[in-house]
Regions:
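Glycine-rich, proline-tolerant flexible connector loops at the mouths of alpha/beta enzymes
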Residues: 52-64, 150-153, 469-483
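Cofactor-cradling patches in redox/metallo enzymes
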Residues: 111-118, 123-194, 200-209
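Glycine-rich active-site/cofactor-binding loop and its immediate structural neighborhood
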Residues: 91-125
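Glycine-rich phosphate-binding active-site loops on the catalytic face of alpha/beta enzymes
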Residues: 197-210, 534-537, 588-592
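Long amphipathic alpha-helical segments
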Residues: 1-87
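Active-site loop segments of alpha/beta catalytic cores
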Residues: 268, 272-312, 361, 383-612
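A contiguous, low-structure linker/loop signature
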Residues: 70, 341-385, 404-408
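Intrinsically disordered, low-complexity terminal tails and inter-domain linkers enriched
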Residues: 216-277
Length: 612
């Protein structure tokens, strides 16, 4: 087999995720006497470089990238020991990990794979890695580069601790520091003293090579710091931020019912066109006027309050609640039968939910990550127990609650099929499944959908005003999966939820994090009434230009950059931009999340600005 032929075949096998074939071909080429470094340089490095390019231009999504990385690792496992025997120097020695307090790892795992495929020797320290552990690993492995990943805004300061610890150990001058993660920016990297910032997992290899060569870290020139109309600080104009190192592993957001919307009396004054009376609007009618584009006298308000805010800022929270009473509330979940599971979902430690999924949490006030999938093997799927106790809703309590408030009431359940599949299967395993969906996955989706429809039907027959559902579908710059796959498998599920709500005279509300612009037309097509999404990730003005007047934007204010680090003036400016972009005699709800890292004065400033 000629060099050009085996190289082309190996590249193709890796890109198509044919792991067994990639390993077998590598063995054949090795047995023919080809040096391992030639296989690395001629096949694996070009394959992963092409995978990165396809990921960047959205020909690949997470399932395809993970499949390619898995095939590359199979081939690399054969040549790594041979490279060591021949003393072939790597491109560099890298220590990588997710910083202390953070359990997210998919993005970090992809970066590690990309670096290995780029010829680096990589020592992956895993997740929740302390500054001391990073420093010790640098010394142990004589590392040239440290890769730091974080997804939570509350763990970003740990990156600075790592830099300082390296300096304290006397190794900072010999090792370079590369950082990445969804909430990070190039300016943050400079602020903490890092040498570089990888805007995307696919660009991590080039970024690493540049900073090790002492060159400017040019990967950020793509516009990650350009502050587009939909990016962090609300300044300047340019492309939206690109997907970051750990972004692929973003934690699915807590169910809205697990955050605590604060409700209180609120009355609008006046009515919009088409109303029969000049009586003040109740909060419920105010929200309906916004949803129906009937010119409500002010924007409806809702604040999602996580326990983190309740324990750290009780006085400020009370002031916000007093000055800006909320119009929307999620009904407390009530079942006549005990629901399985145990522990506190927002406390440090482990929590088992009603489905038997075990979450690990390192920080009080937020929800943790599933680290022991319930369905590690598909053979266990037939025995999976669905929590039918959730169907025993105490209807009398629901009726009394809805009748006793003039707030707009959201149902006390929130189906999340994609995220439930991740919790059951494990995120990385599910992405691999989705690349070539096995029959077991499709059957589980069918069963899950039937259960959710049964649960939603119960709530649709109550007096609540809206049904809710959620799934986080975006990275920082694109969908997590190919739009075609989403439309084939998941869009029909959401269409059923919306149709069910409308048949019973309810509105349909959905939450989805990340850059989901590609599927918003689909959500409008199926009749979704309100969408909670990261509008600053996608571009406020662009979203308004394309979709204002067709769907209600249920918030939200930027919680990656503005809420934790912005000034009140920046918040006010961002709020004005949202109103200008989205409000068309309705179509905008003043919503934000008071969660980890958010400054209380910024939460106050949102409602103050949007009330004007």
């Amino acid at each position: 087999m000629t060099n050009s032929r085996w190289a082309a075949e190996l590249v193709e096998a890796v890109l198509e995720g044919r792991a067994t074939e990639a390993r077998a071909l590598t063995r054949t080429v090795l047995d023919a006497g080809t040096p391992p470094e030639e296989i690395l340089d001629g096949g694996l490095i070009p394959a992963m470089a092409e995978a990165g390019r396809r990921f960047e231009d959205q020909r690949f999504f997470l399932p395809e990238l993970l499949f390619a990385a898995r095939a590359m690792k199979e081939a690399l496992a054969l040549i790594k020991p041979l490279l060591a025997e021949r003393d072939v120097p790597p491109q560099g020695r890298v220590v990588i990990g997710t910083v202390a307090g953070d359990l997210h790892d998919i993005g970090k795992n992809i970066v590690a794979a990309m670096l290995e495929g780029g010829g680096f020797a990589v020592h992956d320290l895993g997740v929740n890695v302390s500054a001391a552990t990073f420093a010790e690993a640098v010394l142990e492995h004589d590392a040239d580069l440290v890769g730091l990943s974080a997804l939570l805004t509350t763990t970003m300061p740990v990156m600075k601790e790592v830099v300082e610890e390296l300096r304290r150990r006397g190794v900072r001058e010999k090792v370079r520091v590369l950082v990445g993660g969804a909430p990070l920016t190039e300016s943050f990297a400079a602020e903490i003293g890092a040498d570089g910032y990888a805007a995307t997992a696919a660009l991590a290899v080039d970024a690493a090579k540049r900073i090790l060569a002492g060159e400017p870290n040019g990967d950020c020139e793509s516009g990650a710091e350009g502050q587009s109309s939909g990016s962090d600080g609300g300044q300047g104009s340019g492309p939206s931020p690109v997907v970051t190192l750990s972004d692929a592993g973003r934690v699915p957001a807590p169910e809205p019912s697990s955050a605590t919307p604060i409700g209180g009396p609120a009355v609008g004054t006046g009515v919009g066109p088409g109303a029969d009376s000049l009586e003040p609007l109740s909060p419920r009618e105010l929200v309906k006027a916004a949803l129906d584009f009937r010119a409500p006298p002010r924007l409806p308000r809702q604040m999602w309050v996580l326990p983190w805010a309740q324990t750290r800022h009780p006085e400020e929270l009370e002031r916000i609640e007093r000055d800006f009473p909320q119009d929307i509330i999620t009904i407390p979940f009530a079942c006549s039968e005990p629901v399985p599971g145990g522990g506190n979902a927002h406390a440090v430690g482990t929590f088992v939910d009603a489905w038997g999924c075990t979450f690990e949490n390192l920080q009080d006030g937020i929800i943790g990550q599933v680290k022991a999938p319930r369905l590690a093997d598909w053979s266990e799927a037939a025995d999976l127990r669905f929590p039918r106790e959730r169907l025993e809703v105490e209807l009398e309590k629901v009726t009394a609650f809805c009748g006793g408030t003039d707030l707009f009431v959201l149902a006390g359940t929130c189906p999340r099929p994609f995220e439930r599949l991740q919790f059951l299967r494990g995120s990385e395993a599910l992405y691999l499944d989705l690349n070539r969906p096995p029959a077991e996955l499709l059957e589980l989706i069918r069963r899950l959908h039937a259960f959710y429809m049964e649960e939603l039907t119960i709530w649709a027959k109550t007096e609540v005003d809206a049904l809710t559902f959620m799934d986080d579908w975006g990275s920082q710059r694109a969908l997590l999966v190919a739009p075609e796959l989403w439309r084939e498998i998941f869009k029909p599920l959401y269409a059923d939820y919306v149709a069910l709500a409308h048949r019973h005279g309810k509105h349909a509300f959905m939450h989805s994090d990340g850059h989901i612009t590609e599927i918003i037309p689909d959500l409008i097509e199926i009749g979704l009434d309100a969408l909670n999404s990261q509008v600053f990730c996608m571009g406020v003005e662009e979203l308004g230009r394309r979709f204002a007047g067709e769907i209600t934007f249920w918030g939200e204010m930027d919680r990656q950059q503005l809420l934790p680090r912005g000034t009140t003036a920046q918040i006010a400016d961002a709020a004005r931009r949202m109103r200008a972009a989205f409000h068309r005699n309705g179509g905008l709800i003043a919503q934000c999340e008071f969660g980890p890292g958010a400054r209380p004065q910024n939460i106050y400033a949102i409602f103050e600005a949007l009330d004007g």
